[in-house]
A protein has these predicted regions:
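Beta-strand signatures of extracellular beta-sandwich domains
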Residues: 89-91
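An anionic, turn-rich surface loop/hairpin at beta-sheet edges
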Residues: 100-128
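Polybasic/polar functional segments that serve as interface/processing modules
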Residues: 1-9, 28, 93
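Solvent-exposed coil/turn segments that connect beta secondary-structure elements
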Residues: 74, 81, 93-96, 143-145
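Transition segment at domain starts
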Residues: 24-72, 104-108
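Short, surface-exposed binding/anchoring microloops in extracellular/periplasmic proteins
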Residues: 66-87
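Hydrophobic membrane-insertion alpha-helices, especially the h-region
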Residues: 5-23
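Short, exposed beta-strand-loop hairpins at the edges of beta-sheets
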Residues: 127-150
Length: 155
């Protein structure tokens, strides 16, 4: 009986430690956030502006984003916070979606823009051949767990 109790208690702590590791590792290894001054300097170059908002149908307490998104010809600039997690990707889509069930069918048509390692105030350089006019939505997606994080329609 004592062996069974020890087995389950140690197993529970192992599972909790593993889950905490998955959650905390991206936070601990995230690059430094962009300075507000850097973000504000890029405001004059913006071609599109939108906002990530909490409360989308694909959001929950672990998957959300909130803040202003500015798009220039050469950068995606974000001033706000995104729920931390592993393996985040930025995509552009031609259709506004706000849930993984809506994104998965059109993922093959979406344009992968960049990996995302920051969860607060970031500036992502963009390949010069990305044409934002061909899309209308920016989306953040967790590739590892196939989870929608947030999206915003910019045109």
């Amino acid at each position: 009986m004592k062996f069974i109790l020890l087995f389950f208690s140690h197993g529970a702590f192992l599972a909790i430690g593993f889950a905490l590791g998955i959650y905390l590792l991206p936070i601990l290894t995230a690059p430094k956030s962009a300075d507000i001054e850097q973000i504000e300097k890029l405001r004059s170059k913006l071609i599109y502006q939108t906002e990530f908002k909490k409360g989308q149908s694909g959001n929950d307490f672990l998957h959300w984003g909130e803040g202003k998104v500015m798009i220039t010809n050469t950068e995606i600039v974000f001033k706000g916070k995104i729920a931390p997690g592993p393996d985040y990707k930025i995509y552009l889509t031609k259709k506004y979606v706000e849930h993984e069930d809506e994104f998965l069918p059109i993922k093959s048509e979406a344009l992968f823009v960049s990996d995302l390692k920051n969860f607060e105030n970031f500036i992502i350089p963009i390949n010069s051949n990305v044409n934002f006019n061909n899309y209308n939505t920016i989306l953040i997606w967790c590739e590892a767990f196939k989870e929608f994080i947030t999206s915003a329609k910019y045109q």
